[in-house]
Amino acid sequence: KGLVAWMKANPGKATFVNQNAAGQTAGVMLQQLTGTSVLFVPYKGAGPAIQDMLAGHVDLLVVQAAAALPQVRAGTLKASANMSPARSPVVPGIPTSDEAGVPGLHLTGWFGLWAPKGTPKEAIAKLNAAMVAALADPGLRQKFSDLGLDVASRDQQTPEGLAAFLKAEIDKWWPIIKAAGIKA
C-alpha cells in the first residue's frame, strides 16, 4: 500500500524490472489497477534482475517464486505480494496482491503437459493418469514446494481442466497484451 502511494506521488519514477512478456504484462496491469505509471526496464533474466533489486538499482520486480525464494527465505529480498488469488502454501506469510492493496493483480506461472494434435484419447488418458499419480506423491509435492511451486488443484489436472484454465488466461491477458503492444 505504501509503495502504491509512493508511485502515485512520483509518476513514472518507479523502475519496474521485467525479464519477459509476462512480467511486462503484470506491470501494465499494475498500472491499470492502481492508476500509476512505471518505467519498464527490460532484463535478460531473473538472475540479473534479482541482483539489481538486491543492490537497490530498481524498485519493482516480478519473478516466479522459485527464482526469488532463496533470497526471500534468507531475508535479503522482501516479497511484497503473491500474485495468486489465494495465499500459497509454500510461502503462507506473503500476502496476496488483494491483501496488499492491489485487488485483481493476479498473475501465476504454470506448467502444462502437452501432446501432439491427433494423439489418441486413450494415450492422453493414460498420460494424464500417470501425471495425476505422480502429482499425488508426497515426495514429489515436497520437491515442488521446496522450489516454490504449488501443485494445481485436482480439477485442473485433467485435459478439460487445463483447457478451461488456458481459455480463461487467454481471455484475461490478451486484451491487456494487445492494448499495450507487448511482444514476446
Labelled PLM ranges:
Residues 73, 99, 121-184:
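An extracytoplasmic/periplasmic, membrane-proximal ligand-sensing/linker region
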Residues 18-22, 45, 60, 64, ...:
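Extracytoplasmic/periplasmic, Sec-exported soluble proteins
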Residues 68, 102, 162:
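Acidic, amphipathic alpha-helical patches
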Residues 13-94:
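Ligand-binding pocket segment of bilobal, Venus flytrap-like solute-binding proteins
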Residues 81-117, 147, 154-155:
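Periplasmic-binding protein-like
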Residues 1-48, 97-99, 110-143:
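Hinge/capping helix and adjacent helix->loop/strand transition within the periplasmic-binding protein
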Residues 60-64, 83, 104, 127, ...:
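Short, structured secondary-structure boundary patches
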Residues 37-39, 59, 103, 150, ...:
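Residue-level detector of anion-binding/catalytic polar loops
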